[in-house]
Structures are given as C-alpha cells and as structure tokens.
Amino acid sequence: MRTSNSKKHLGHTARKRFGQNFLSDMNVIHNIVAAINPRNEDFLLEIGPGLGALTEPVAEQVEKLTVIELDRDLAERLRHHPFLHHKLTVIEQDALRFNFRDYFDSLNLNHHQAIRIFGNLPYNISTPLMFHLFKFHDLIQDMHFMLQKEVVKRLCAAPNSKAYGRLTIMAQYYCQVIPVLEVPPTAFKPAPKVDSAVVRLMPYKTLPYPVKDVYWLNRVTTHAFNQRRKTLRNALSTLFTAQQLEMLGINLTDRAENLTISDYARLANWLCDNPPAIDTNQEILYDEL
C-alpha cells in the first residue's frame, strides 16, 4: 500500500500509533529553543525527539543531550546522526514507563545541576505523560512541551471556567504554569487537525498547597470532576457527608470548577486523617481531565 507523501517528512513516514507530527517551521523552532534557553551546565533531556527538529538546534548549543525515543527507526537514526551522534545519549524506551528517578540517580549528577526536560509530545499520550513526570517534580527545574492548544488552556485555567479541571489542579499543585506561544497546524508535517501551543512548567521547590498524601488529592478531584455537572454535595457524597463539607467551608451547591486548589488540598488533608469507610474506586480517565 502506498503512503501519502503528506505523511512523509525527511524520508520517514509518520506513524499514527505513535501520534507523530513532525515540527518543520524554522521560525517556530527558533522561538521554542529561545524559550528553552539551553545552557551547557544543565542536564537536558528531550522526550520524543522524532526527526530532530528541536534536537539539532539545542544540541548545537550544548555538549551533551539525552533523548528518549520509542520509535526504533528514529532512535537508530539519531544514534547515527551525521554531526551530533557524539553528543547524544539515545534511550530507546517508552517515556510513560521510564523511571526518571532511577536514571538520574544512576548518573550521580551534581546536586546543583538543573534537570530540564522538553519535547514535542505525541498528543495521544501528553496528559498521562505529564502525570507520570509530576512524580519526579522534585528532580526537575523546568519542562517545555508542545501540546494540543486545548490542553495548554486546561493547564493554565483558573477556577470558575470551563477549561478548569483535574489536570489544571494537579499541574498547578506541582508547577507554575506559563503559556509560551501558540503554533498553527501548518508548522507540522503532517499537519495535525488541531492547533498547538508551547507551555513552560516550573516545579515548585516548596509546594504552595502541600497535602499529606497526594493519593487523596487524586481521589477527591477524580470524584469531583468525573461528575462535574453535579453539585459537590452529590459528587463527593461517597467521601464526605454534607455536614463535613460545610464544616470544611464548602458551599454544598458549588460544583467542581468553583473550588480552588487550596480548597481541594484542604479536602484531601481531611480525608487523609479521616478516610471514608467506603471509597468508590473510580478509574482515572485522562481524556476527561
């Protein structure tokens, strides 16, 4: 079967199962690299380097760059890059399953060396990948990611807005979230059907709303936003009684998007000390975040 030329870029056919859309607009690439501002003294790691649109200009500014690439053909291509192969450490693995803590520990990095992560993430795994990376927030100085524009809106959202959801709360619990630039579909080959945007995530050194156990923050936000059209009295009924919510300063007629991160942290800490007898084990659905 012939492959459409629109799906082929620099001799490589984009694979739908990997969510591959290759960045090709040089002006956009320049702006992203400028936002990353790579420094030789940093430990830089790229997720999903693809055909090297960001890899090459970043590697030109530093002596070493580590990349994680699942596509074996692209990983092999990077290992034999004509002028950067000696700078690159290529890890051929799924970033969703990669233990960043074990890897960084194995390198015996200087305690003061900043770990900085960037990438043009496949949109089909971007949300679960960010949740995976949040587990290692204490190791990371910053992250720059190309994402679907709608996802960036959710990351940056404020309470009382439609975009505000569980992804918003968990991202802003761990990180300061800063939108960087918007990117049109024409900047990619093949062009995606959605607009894109670049976001900067800067993990807090000290969490502004610490919780005793993040499990309970996950649980309360999952319950609230999986039923976001319901009042909190009903959405959180398996976790709290109406009297308990009122005691914690929650308006029973409010909905999930009306609470701040501080409110959710307060609820999570109360649950940690007073776990419910029955907690419905609701599956976390990333496409509903």
Swiss-Prot record:
S-adenosyl-L-methionine binds at N21, L23, G48, E69, D94, N120. Pfam families: RrnaAD. Its EC number is 2.1.1.182. Belongs to the class I-like SAM-binding methyltransferase superfamily. rRNA adenine N(6)-methyltransferase family. RsmA subfamily. This is Ribosomal RNA small subunit methyltransferase A. It catalyses: adenosine(1518)/adenosine(1519) in 16S rRNA + 4 S-adenosyl-L-methionine = N(6)-dimethyladenosine(1518)/N(6)-dimethyladenosine(1519) in 16S rRNA + 4 S-adenosyl-L-homocysteine + 4 H(+). GO terms for molecular function: 16S rRNA (adenine(1518)-N(6)/adenine(1519)-N(6))-dimethyltransferase activity; RNA binding. Coiled coil: none annotated. The keyword Cell membrane does not apply. Its main location: cytoplasm. SMART domains: rADc. GO terms for cellular component: cytosol. It is found in: Cytoplasm. The lineage of its organism: Bacteria, Pseudomonadati, Pseudomonadota, Gammaproteobacteria, Pasteurellales. Specifically dimethylates two adjacent adenosines (A1518 and A1519) in the loop of a conserved hairpin near the 3'-end of 16S rRNA in the 30S particle. May play a critical role in biogenesis of 30S subunits. CDD domains: AdoMet_MTases. Keywords: Cytoplasm, Methyltransferase, RNA-binding, rRNA processing, S-adenosyl-L-methionine, Transferase. The gene is rsmA. It comes from the Bacteria. InterPro entries: KsgA/Erm, rRNA_Ade_diMease-like_C, rRNA_Ade_Mease_Trfase_CS, rRNA_Ade_methylase_Trfase_N, rRNA_adenine_dimethylase, SAM-dependent_MTases_sf.
